[in-house]
From Swiss-Prot:
GO molecular function: phosphate transmembrane transporter activity; symporter activity
Similarity annotation: Belongs to the major facilitator superfamily. Sodium/anion cotransporter family.
Ranges of Polar residues composition bias in the record: 460-483
Positions of region (Disordered): 447-483
One Gene Ontology cellular component: membrane
The protein's name: Putative inorganic phosphate cotransporter
Subcellular location as annotated: Membrane
Residue intervals passing through the bilayer: 64-84, 90-110, 187-207, 292-312, 349-369, 383-403, 420-440
Species in which this protein is naturally found: Drosophila ananassae (Fruit fly)
Chief location category: membrane
One GO-annotated biological process of the protein: phosphate ion transmembrane transport
């Protein structure tokens, strides 16, 4: 259910990136296409002007529309991280996604009746609703997943982000071209229905932690709790704010997260525009081909997570070394790919191949910094994620604004403007990944263990304890859902 929830969340984030290509009347604004034709010559597949939309929004306005979701998204990160620690995560996550899904139905009327700023307001509210998804998911993972399974299970859940993108982009392209009510509005109606159904199912069938699940086997419950918390009763101490603020491993995660989000949001929000404006793919092809990098990321994230867990369980690498090696793949890979793609010019196949490989390697972050919060502090993982995710999305919301302003000048060559966009994203990826390699850690921090009985890292105790075999022959843990 958490995998599907992450998928729904990213559907809501990414569908506007494809929809806006169909919404905007490209012949009514200057996009610099004439200069692009001079650079690359005539393309074999020209843009079909009949696909132009109803709104004369330039690149800068499109950047504000694409970023408006993230303004709402970042506001709710830290508050929900604190609330989830105190009251539990399940209700905040479920009702937040329900708000996000219901407001998706209002996107078409907001755009047509309220213009740019009406649309921005609705997308802002959607962002508010989606705010709990990551900190609350992290908090629930901390309660359900033993330390020696975090790479694999964490990657499996967060790979829902790529799965949602894979579904959203091609389906949004098809709905924009063949859907009802002018095409693009059907994107928000269809995904609004899907998100609403998931939210209701999540609130009915999912439980906060093993202790509240009515059907979980007692041995399984004991195994999960002891592998996470030792033999002590699970406690809820106050958040150690001062220790967190002084923690270099925390800042390593913070900067890695910020660098990732800036680069990732640059690609996620701007790739469909790049595919249309520079690579000149049709609307239908745009959505399908824009999803290929995220298909690669989904598949590679799962493969890399298995390698990461093997590195840890085989004891060939320390937890710290594993996180840094895998995270380097996840951040240096896309950074170098963006640099390479900026020099491929008009070669559509080569550009798409490089971006697909680069974004695919980005899947390493799910077994790198993205799951590292749980290593440092199982007790406060959700709160830490709320801080880093809030900061990361503040960085991420700058990406479409920066890109929109950089590519909005029709007097400059389009390829040159996009090269700057790619260079900036690559630089941020590499610098932040390097900071993580210098200061990151996989060790459980002292401020997560308030009692002397729990000074021993949970990873050590869990790695020497075999999971109980259940009556059906499977090993713990099972799914969070009761279904």
């Amino acid at each position: 259910m958490l995998f599907l929830g992450m998928a729904n969340a990213y559907v809501m984030r990414t569908n506007m990136s494809v929809a806006i290509v169909a919404m905007v009347n490209h012949t009514a604004i200057k996009s610099g296409e004439e200069e692009y034709d001079d650079e690359c010559g005539d393309r074999d597949i020209p843009i079909d002007d009949s696909q132009d939309g109803e709104f004369p929004w330039n690149a800068a306005l499109q950047g504000y529309i694409l970023s408006s979701f993230f303004y709402g998204y970042v506001i709710t990160q830290i508050p929900f991280g604190i609330l989830a620690k105190k009251y539990g995560s399940l209700r905040f996550l479920g009702y937040g996604m329900l708000i996000n899904s219901v407001f998706a139905f209002l996107v078409p009327v907001a755009a047509r009746e309220g213009g740019v700023w009406g649309l921005c307001a609705v997308r802002f509210i959607q962002g508010l609703g989606e705010g709990p998804i990551v900190p609350c998911t992290h908090a629930m993972l901390a309660k359900w997943i033993p330390p020696n399974e975090r790479s694999r299970m964490g990657a499996a859940v967060y790979a829902g982000a790529q799965f949602g993108t894979i579904i959203s982009m091609p389906l949004s392209g098809l709905l924009a071209e063949y859907g009802f009510d002018g095409g693009w509005p059907s994107i928000f109606y269809v995904f609004g229905i899907v998100g609403t159904v998931w939210s209701i199912a999540f609130l009915i069938f999912v439980y906060e932690d093993p202790s509240t699940h009515p059907k979980i086997d007692e041995r399984e419950k004991k195994y999960i709790n002891e592998s996470l918390w030792g033999t002590d009763v699970i406690k809820s101490p106050p958040i150690p704010f001062k220790s967190i603020v002084k923690s270099l491993p925390f800042y390593a995660i913070l900067f890695a997260h910020m660098g990732h989000n800036y680069g990732y949001e640059t690609l996620m929000t701007e790739l469909p525009t790049y595919m249309k404006q520079v690579l000149r793919f049709s609307l239908k092809s745009n959505g399908l081909l824009s999803s290929l990098p995220y298909l690669a990321m989904w598949l590679l994230s799962m493969f890399i997570s298995v390698i990461a867990d093997w590195m840890i369980s085989s004891k060939r690498f320390s937890l710290t070394a594993t996180r840094k090696i895998i995270n380097s793949i996840g951040q240096y890979g896309p950074g170098l790919a963006l640099i390479a793609a900026s020099y491929t010019g008009c070669d559509r196949a080569l550009t798409l191949a490089i971006l697909t490989i680069g974004v695919g390697l980005n899947g390493g972050i799910y077994s790198g910094f993205k799951i590292n919060h749980l290593d440092l502090t199982p007790r406060f993982a959700g709160f830490l994620m709320s801080i880093t995710n809030c900061s990361a999305n503040l960085a991420g919301l700058l990406a479409p604004i920066a890109a929109g302003n950089l590519i909005s000048d029709p007097s400059k060559p389009v390829m040159g403007q996009w090269q700057i966009v790619f260079f900036i994203a690559a630089f941020v990826y590499i610098i932040c990944g390097t900071f993580y390699n210098i200061f990151g850690s996989g060790e459980r921090q002292f401020w997560d263990n308030p009692s002397e009985d729990e000074q021993k890292p949970a990873l050590e105790s869990s790695s020497t304890t075999n999971p109980p075999r259940l009556s059906n022959g499977s090993s713990a843990p099972r799914a969070i859902s009761s279904s």
